[in-house]
Amino acid sequence: MLERGLSELGSDAGGDQRERLLRFLELLRKWNRVYSLTAIEDPCEGVRLHLLDSLSIASFLHGRRVLDVGTGPGLPGIPLAIVQPERRFVLLDCNAKKIRFVRQAVIELGLANVVPVQARIESFTDAEGFDCVLARAYASLAEIWTDAAPLLRTGGTVLALKGRRPEAELGDLPAGVAVGIHRLRVPGVEAERHLAELKPTGQDS
């Protein structure tokens, strides 16, 4: 299922990367028995809703530094970091048990390009800034932009994963924000998936 799904997404993930993706899923299932990190327990659903859903936005990432806000148990950050080792990912969450799991997963999977951080985005600072800030099931677009915009480098974008097209949220965005809405196709998932791409008005892609 994973190999077929990756093929449908156009991913060129190699054998070692596919193995790491499945190992991550197994680690998540193992820790979930004690820490209740996710409501998804079925392995097939995990492939679709954790791995493939996360990787459906891989082609939208750019630049070297990526921040995953409200990463929870490392989603979408860890799957993306596995298939894009050339980028550096900071995985941010205020939940101690979830960041504890992410730290252990990073160690066991040998992900040298991932830094887990336990903090709230409102109090998080970073001198270098980020090319992409990711948010999956995090907040409204206006809230995401308010929190994430100060952390963007010049040319940076906020990528917010949504279910249905977030029409009602678009009107709440402040002036000066350019928005692109992309329909995502996730193999094996019938529910709607959209990606909102936010950046300052007038900024070239």
From Swiss-Prot:
Catalytic activity field: guanosine(527) in 16S rRNA + S-adenosyl-L-methionine = N(7)-methylguanosine(527) in 16S rRNA + S-adenosyl-L-homocysteine
Keyword Mitochondrion appears in the UniProt entry: no
Record-level GO cellular component terms: cytosol
Gene3D superfamilies associated with the record: Vaccinia Virus protein VP39
Entry EC no(s): 2.1.1.170
Entry's transmembrane regions: none
Keywords: Cytoplasm, Methyltransferase, rRNA processing, S-adenosyl-L-methionine, Transferase
Matching InterPro entries: rRNA_ssu_MeTfrase_G, SAM-dependent_MTases_sf
SUPFAM superfamilies from the UniProt entry: S-adenosyl-L-methionine-dependent methyltransferases
Residues annotated for S-adenosyl-L-methionine binding in this entry: 70, 75, 121-122, 136
Pfam families in the record: GidB
GO molecular function list: rRNA (guanine-N7-)-methyltransferase activity
Cellular location(s): Cytoplasm
PANTHER family per record: S-ADENOSYL-L-METHIONINE-DEPENDENT METHYLTRANSFERASES SUPERFAMILY PROTEIN
Function: Specifically methylates the N7 position of guanine in position 527 of 16S rRNA.
Family recorded in the similarity comment: Belongs to the methyltransferase superfamily. RNA methyltransferase RsmG family.
The protein, known as: Ribosomal RNA small subunit methyltransferase G
